[in-house]
């Protein structure tokens, strides 16, 4: 008699090219109100949240590995063990438009201050896209019983663009644990279930790339290091210097507490 394998393994590589990505590019001066369908008096007003289509193509590629198995070859009650895992790695590169306000003072034919939008770009990851996603679950099935303990991990996500590097936002890596159990009862179709979510009470934190000198927990040595770098080399990249600041030293934009939830009940399947 031949036994059929109860193991599934899958690997894939994906690549995407996105054209016309819509995103919030920050502030923009209204040079020509007609261009935006606005009345004439709004000339030189500022749009605080200007959404636009990115004229630069967005490139994204990555790999995904999926593995599922049931330990049918183990002796006795251990045959009910199951294990599933999924790993995704993603790399993205986006040229985001960056608009600088340029002021020009003219004296002829009359005194005036002209404001123009000077467009440039900066490179970063795709918005709302993590670099790594890891999922796994360990479970056990036996007759009418089924249980799963699972973990979900999402690496930090680029969550908000901004003209100023230090005001761009990333989330901290997020990891949570869940538990799901069900047991069939003596009445056909009736089940007892328990669902427990976020057992470790993980907190979702979003941080600015900059820091605050007013924060009592901030280590001033990082700021002193940045000043020394700027004095020794005026062309030093602010992006590189901010990347050297540990995540927990950066200012929090906000944090969300979801808490732990446990559901207990009966379910009847028709």
Segments and roles (model prediction):
Residues 152-161, 183-270:
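C-terminal beta-signal and adjacent terminal beta-strands/loops
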Residues 2-5, 67-75, 81, 142-144, ...:
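Outer-membrane beta-barrel proteins
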Residues 1, 12, 64-68, 137-139, ...:
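Outer-membrane beta-barrel architecture
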Residues 5, 57-63, 130-134, 173-177, ...:
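Residues that define the transmembrane beta-barrel architecture of outer-membrane proteins
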Residues 15, 36-158:
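Gram-negative outer-membrane beta-barrel transporters
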Residues 7-11, 79-85, 136, 145-149, ...:
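Transmembrane beta-strands of outer-membrane beta-barrel proteins
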Residues 25-51, 97-122, 163-165, 209-250:
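Solvent-exposed loop segments that connect transmembrane elements
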Residues 1-17, 131, 137:
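Structural signature of Gram-negative outer-membrane beta-barrels, strongest in the C-terminal barrel
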